[in-house]
């Protein structure tokens, strides 16, 4: 019976092994209680003891002991055992060094930090943030990662390029280094000028002719065409190039003459000259380029040919036809004819001054070349009549449609005697672009979308081809579609994308002339002698208050009450100078009011039309004599009467400036009121359809003005690069690829988008012939000297290293000067000159360069002190305005040489 009870006791103890209570851990101990005795040893874990009834129990009573190593202890009230130590009892939260973390925190390396599955995503001064996927810790906060970038221009206006990550982030995520230039201190100066090199002694007759072609009377184009830094790619790290046509005014005269294409580096040489890479003409000896043709730059290859990225050059010939060149040497010194079309355009399309464009009309990745209402295949140059036109190519001639539709009177894009100046846009936003040529909008395939029939005129047409108008595109109402802008025979037209008038804007608006002297008018009947002022049908004074130039215009006369003035039973007709066709329109927010205006240059005035300038009375700031006119300033352009203009906000103050050159001067007007901010009266031109352009032509992060000039004075003419003498002009894009430039029509590296973003829908655009005001308008570099140390030395020389960096927000090109000075222990000073950087300094980057100090004979050198100042030419001159120019200098500790005792 005792034996059975003993077995029963053992079974009970074993059964108790399922009890997890720390005070009743059922371990086998010494048997007892009578009956047969079974000796069970008590083998307890650290922190336990053997109870009287043979069980292992905690030494701390109701709670487990805290054991670590070979010792165990009991934790005090309010604490718990964690990893062998008694720590504060934080319930379900993490404990860190005696502190309870919040329920949103975890313990990392002894500190409470945000709960984060990836500790690498922790952020904030105290790691209180955990950045989500698609975010990064920047500037102490989590910033969303957006598009990839190399430069700030790759990002949206409210973003900047975080170079360490290579992505765009919101600008507010970091403290941005900025320099905001003072306004009102407008001081342009010529940075450099291009003129051709003299012909070599062994030059051919043609080479001698070409060397004498120094005048320019067309609109230059700018893009990166050369690999200047030798890295094997042509991109935004290289210096842009200027492409233009030059001719010989003295030998050939002014108009529609023979010329050659020049490819010139946009960088200014130290002596104020510019470097010519190449000179181009057609395949045959007589294939001269028209001296007033435009230049279009862009990649003509299909966009799936990833190995072909360098833009090509497109121009038109003097006597019809089109040509394209492609680069065959990385440095731009060699080009070959990619294709030559000797047929289109013909003299039915142009009599001089054709302005080609490049676009992908049908969004197939294969660009087209557009001249007026002619479309050529961009890859081959083939036209609609070529039997070997590739099946996948698009080509057409709007004149063919007119021939098939007698009386259609379809537009080409001419005004006065120059053109065509057409453009391309996706007006209805269906993903396919239209060709806008004068008064006709063509579908991508050459079919007619619509034609506006003119019923009025304000000028005679000075050319032998019909004047159907120059074009631009913008948005002047509340819808999302684009409106067509036409300047034609002294009148402005704005039409909806469907060809109907825009609500609230009349058709047409007359372009007024400017006050000034004019030849005596004649009257019909001839017996009429005026005794009171005469007016036209719109109530404008007739001569001499209204002047035009370039031929006769017959204007019926009215009195001040609007009644016809009669003589001998007939209404009096006043004959006066009458050609005032006016130049290609520029669309921009001239006055900073948030609405787009239109500028154009007539024969006698530059006029800005503002569609808020209406009502009775007219709003303040408007021209009080002419409804719809913001301002007008007299000019001098009776030769072509169709010069162009561009607009840019040089100071970034929200008020744009107008850049314009006529026969006798180059001027910059304030956009809000036409005040002349700068005038260069040494400028001279016979004028065609040319205009100055604004572009970062040398990739220095600042804008410049590129001005063509056919000035025949010995020290003038060619191409002039104007810049601000104080380096205050804000930055812009490095590209202006064609006359009909609208920013979104081309990427900064010269690629032609399949479906470009409609310019007028972009928050900072809605412009035409105006370069972009980029995000980070005031971004600036912050140059620092990071380190100075000795590399090597002996009795004859010291070799020292200087590390300079850019802690700012603006990338800067090579050539930043650092002035270096050595001072000996006895205070003798040696100027080692200014050392240029050899590569780009992007934000956060550094460059190390070496300087060698040759120790003069007899000089005791116990230790040298080297001082370095970055962005210093040694004479106090700086290349850049910085956000902090007080941290540019550094002085080393005495640099000793172990080899010199």
Language model feature labels by segment:
Residues 37-39, 90-91, 113-118, 145-146, ...:
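Low-complexity, Pro/Thr/Ser/Gly/Ala-rich linker/spacer regions in secreted
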Residues 38-49, 65-77, 92-103, 118-134, ...:
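Disulfide-braced loops of extracellular cysteine-rich modules
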Residues 147, 152, 163-780:
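Extracytoplasmic/lumenal domain signature
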Residues 9-56, 61-62, 68, 81-86, ...:
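Ser/Thr-rich, Pro/Gly/Ala-heavy low-complexity intrinsically disordered linkers and tails
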């Amino acid at each position: 019976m005792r034996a059975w009870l003993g077995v029963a006791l053992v079974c009970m103890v074993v059964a108790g092994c399922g009890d997890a209570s720390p005070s009743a851990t059922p371990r086998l101990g010494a048997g007892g209680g009578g009956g047969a005795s079974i000796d069970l040893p008590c083998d307890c874990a650290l922190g336990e003891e053997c109870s009287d009834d043979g069980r292992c129990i905690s030494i701390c009573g109701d709670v487990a002991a805290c054991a670590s190593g070979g010792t165990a202890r009991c934790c005090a009230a309010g604490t718990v055992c964690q990893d062998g130590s008694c720590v504060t009892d934080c319930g379900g939260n993490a404990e860190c060094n005696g502190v309870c973390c919040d329920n949103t925190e975890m313990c990392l390396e002894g500190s409470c930090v945000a709960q984060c599955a990836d500790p690498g995503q922790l952020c904030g001064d105290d790691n209180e943030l955990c950045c989500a996927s698609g975010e990064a810790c920047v500037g102490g906060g989590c910033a969303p990662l957006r598009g990839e970038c190399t430069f700030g221009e790759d990002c949206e206006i409210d973003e900047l390029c975080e170079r360490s990550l290579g992505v765009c982030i919101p600008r507010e995520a970091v403290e941005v280094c900025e320099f905001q230039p003072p306004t009102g201190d407008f001081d342009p100066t010529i940075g450099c000028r291009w003129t051709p090199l003299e012909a070599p002694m062994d030059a051919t007759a043609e080479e001698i002719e070409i060397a004498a072609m120094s005048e320019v009377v067309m609109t230059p184009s700018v893009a990166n065409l050369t690999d200047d830094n030798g890295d094997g790619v042509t991109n935004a790290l290289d210096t842009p190039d200027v492409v233009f046509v030059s001719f010989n005014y003295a030998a050939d005269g002014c108009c529609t003459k023979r010329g050659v294409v020049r490819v010139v580096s946009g960088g200014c040489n130290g002596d104020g000259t510019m470097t010519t890479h190449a000179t181009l003409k057609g395949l045959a000896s007589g294939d001269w380029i028209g001296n007033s043709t435009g230049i279009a730059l862009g990649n003509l290859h299909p966009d799936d040919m990833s190995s072909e990225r360098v833009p090509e050059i497109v121009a038109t010939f003097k006597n019809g036809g089109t040509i394209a060149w492609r680069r065959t040497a990385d440095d731009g010194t060699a080009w070959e004819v990619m294709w030559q079309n000797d047929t289109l355009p013909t003299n039915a399309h142009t009599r001089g001054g054709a302005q080609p464009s490049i676009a992908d009309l049908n969004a197939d990745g294969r660009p087209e070349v557009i001249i007026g209402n002619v479309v050529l295949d961009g890859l081959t140059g083939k036209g609609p009549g070529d039997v070997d036109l590739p099946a996948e190519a698009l080509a057409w001639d709007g004149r063919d449609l007119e021939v098939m539709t007698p009386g259609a009177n379809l537009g080409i894009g001419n005004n006065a005697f120059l053109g065509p100046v057409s453009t391309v846009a996706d007006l209805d936003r269906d993903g396919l672009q239209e060709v806008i040529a004068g008064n006709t909008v063509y579908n991508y395939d050459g079919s007619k979308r619509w034609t506006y029939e003119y019923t009025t005129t304000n000028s005679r047409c000075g050319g032998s081809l019909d004047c159907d108008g120059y074009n631009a595109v913008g948005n002047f109402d509340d819808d999302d579609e684009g409106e067509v802008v036409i300047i034609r025979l002294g009148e402005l037209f704005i039409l909806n994308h469907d060809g109907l008038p825009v609500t609230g804007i009349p058709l047409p608006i007359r372009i007024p002339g400017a006050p000034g002297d004019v030849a005596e008018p004649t009257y019909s009947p001839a017996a009429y002698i005026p005794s009171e002022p005469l007016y036209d049908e719109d109530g404008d004074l007739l001569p001499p208050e209204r002047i035009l130039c370039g031929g006769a215009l017959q204007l019926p006369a009215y009195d001040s009450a609007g009644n016809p003035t009669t003589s001998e039973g007939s209404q009096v007709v006043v004959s006066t100078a009458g050609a005032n066709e006016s130049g290609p329109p520029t669309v921009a927010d001239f006055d900073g009011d948030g609405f787009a205006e239109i500028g154009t240059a007539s024969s006698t005035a530059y006029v800005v039309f503002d569609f808020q300038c209406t009502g009775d009375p007219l709003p303040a700031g408007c021209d009080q004599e002419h409804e719809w006119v913001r301002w007008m300033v007299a000019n001098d352009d009776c030769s072509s009467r169709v010069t162009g203009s561009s607009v840019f906000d040089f100071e970034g103050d929200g008020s744009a400036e107008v850049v314009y050159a006529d026969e006798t001067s180059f001027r910059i007007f304030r956009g809000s009121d036409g005040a002349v901010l700068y005038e260069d009266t040494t400028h001279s031109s016979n004028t065609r359809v040319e205009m100055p352009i604004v572009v970062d032509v040398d990739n220095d992060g600042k804008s410049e003005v590129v001005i063509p000039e056919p000035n025949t004075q010995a020290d003038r003419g060619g191409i002039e690069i104007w810049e601000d003498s104080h380096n205050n002009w804000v930055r812009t894009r490095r590209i202006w690829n064609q006359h009909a430039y609208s920013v979104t029509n081309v990427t900064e590296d010269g690629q032609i988008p399949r479906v470009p973003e409609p310019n007028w829908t972009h928050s900072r655009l809605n412009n035409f012939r105006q370069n972009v005001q980029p995000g980070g308008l005031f971004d600036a570099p912050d140059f620092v000297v990071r380190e100075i140390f000795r590399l090597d030395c002996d009795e004859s020389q010291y070799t020292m290293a200087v590390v300079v960096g850019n802690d700012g927000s603006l990338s800067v090109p090579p050539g930043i000067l650092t002035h270096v000075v050595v001072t000996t222990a006895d205070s003798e000073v040696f100027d080692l000159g200014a050392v240029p950087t050899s590569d780009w300094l992007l934000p956060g980057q550094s460059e190390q360069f070496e300087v060698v100090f040759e120790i003069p004979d007899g000089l005791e050198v116990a230790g040298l002190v080297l001082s370095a100042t970055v962005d210093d030419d040694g004479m106090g001159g700086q290349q850049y305005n910085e956000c902090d120019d007080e941290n540019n200098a550094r002085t080393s500790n005495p640099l000793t040489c172990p080899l010199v005792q």
